[in-house]
Design a protein with these regions (language model features):
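Transmembrane alpha-helix segments characteristic
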Residues: 138, 290-312, 321
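Multi-pass, polyprenyl lipid-linked donor-dependent membrane glycosyltransferases
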Residues: 104-108, 122-123, 132-164, 180-191, ...
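Signature aromatic-anchored transmembrane alpha helix within multi-pass, membrane-resident enzymes
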Residues: 216-220, 338-367
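Membrane-interface transmembrane helices that cradle and orient dolichyl/undecaprenyl
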Residues: 124, 162-173, 336
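Membrane-lumen/periplasm interface segments of specific transmembrane helices
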Residues: 23-39, 43, 51-53, 192-201, ...
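Transmembrane-helix signature of polytopic, membrane-embedded enzymes
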Residues: 96, 116-139, 296-300
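Transmembrane-helix motifs of polytopic, lipid-linked glycan transferases
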Residues: 88, 103-123, 285-286
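Short hydrophobic/aromatic helix or loop-helix immediately within or flanking a transmembrane segment
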Residues: 51-95, 254-258
Length: 367
């Protein structure tokens, strides 16, 4: 086995498990800090009372137990993939729906990290960079949701699987994984961007054309299947998007939204949308690093995810949407490989991730 090729899964786990465990210890520390801080004022319980089922986790649990007809119409904005797999886990794992969803989220995050390790090894042949990428994913500030009962872990496992299989030109496997990703998160539609770039490189011609076409369209098709079903079931066209729009506002020009956000840094929203703009600034730096150091398809996917996140009046959860654009962590790994920046980058992540988790459990940050 050469130094740059992945070996058995056991060797991947030796790299991944320390980062995976560390992330969960940091999230546990954040939970403990918020719990020790006491209950919320005015008798209103804080999200910390819900533990790993806080925020969207409650929605996913309700959907698993009651289905879309058993929750308010707002629930239709959550795509069904995570819930459907959660039901399978619940059928075989004791402990109830909450345990099933949390277990699925955490195991999926572990799988995502293993696949990322293999992807970076395949792209770079550099085990040090692959290890840093795993740590970057595990400690990426919004990655605390990979510990909670959120669908991000499952989506990332599928999305990284898409990128890995596209790199290997396993187009039918890409199509299957992308279709599943589209049923987990609407961001699955954006997987068409990196897959298209990988499938239609110069000189490829028409070899295996049906498989490559299927790979490109599978993500949007997965999203479309649920949107079609929900539209028919609730007798309202595009109802998942309409519900999401009612919460995040109408689509806006991303550039204009960014300019407006800069002004919010100095107004009453300095601790609200203003902080999201600071995050955007950091993500733009990562985007430049990504385009300069990695194949363009990764930068294109990350850029598409960021643009979609910015194309809304309400920027809540923007950082989590950026996490779906998983190549951002490749840029973090690149920066962490530089001697002067490495310690600062990892220290920022090690502080930022539990800080955001604590803010979310406190109720002052929407994950």
């Amino acid at each position: 086995m050469t130094a740059g090729r992945p070996g058995p899964v056991r060797s991947d786990l030796q790299v991944v498990l320390p980062a995976w465990i560390t992330a969960r210890l940091l999230v546990a520390a954040a939970w403990l800090v918020v719990r020790l801080a006491g209950p919320g004022g005015g008798g209103v319980p804080r999200p910390v009372e819900r533990g790993l089922l806080a925020w969207d986790g409650d929605w996913y649990q309700s959907l698993l137990v009651h289905g879309y007809d058993g929750v308010s119409v707002e629930g239709v904005r959550f795509f069904p993939g995570f819930v459907l797999v959660g039901r399978l886990v619940d059928a075989i794992l004791p402990g109830g729906p909450g345990v099933a969803l949390v277990s699925l989220a955490n195991v999926s995050a572990l799988v995502a990290a293993v696949l990322l390790h293999r992807l970076v090894l395949l792209e770079t042949g550099n085990r040090a960079v692959a290890r840093r990428a795993v740590w970057a994913l595990s400690l990426f500030p919004p990655a605390f949701v990979l510990v909670w009962a959120y669908g991000e872990g499952l989506f990332l496992a599928l999305a990284i699987g898409v990128l890995l299989c596209a790199r290997r030109e396993q187009w039918w496997t890409v199509a299957l994984l992308a279709l599943a990703a589209g049923l987990v998160r609407p961001t699955g539609a954006l997987l068409a961007v990196p897959v298209l770039a990988a499938a239609w490189r110069p000189g490829v011609g028409s070899v295996r054309l049906p498989a490559r076409i299927a790979a490109v369209v599978a993500g949007p098709v997965g999203v479309g299947i649920f949107v079609w079903w929900a539209s028919v079931h609730f007798n309202e066209a595009f109802i998942p998007m309409n519900v999401q729009r009612s919460l995040r506002g109408d689509p806006v020009n991303p550039v204009r939204r960014l300019v407006d956000g800069v002004g919010e840094l100095f107004g009453g929203e300095a601790l609200g949308d203003g902080l999201h703009i600071v995050a955007v600034a950091g993500l733009l730096v990562l985007l430049v690093v990504l385009f300069r150091n990695w194949p363009a398809r990764y930068g294109a996917f990350a850029a598409a995810c960021l643009l979609v996140g910015l194309a809304a009046d309400n920027l809540n959860s923007l950082e989590r949407y950026a996490l779906n654009g998983v190549p951002f962590v490749l840029a973090v790994a690149t920066l962490a490989s530089r001697r002067r920046l490495g310690p600062a980058v990892m220290a920022f992540s090690a502080v930022g991730m539990p800080f955001l988790a604590a803010m979310a459990w406190w109720g002052s940050y929407v994950p």
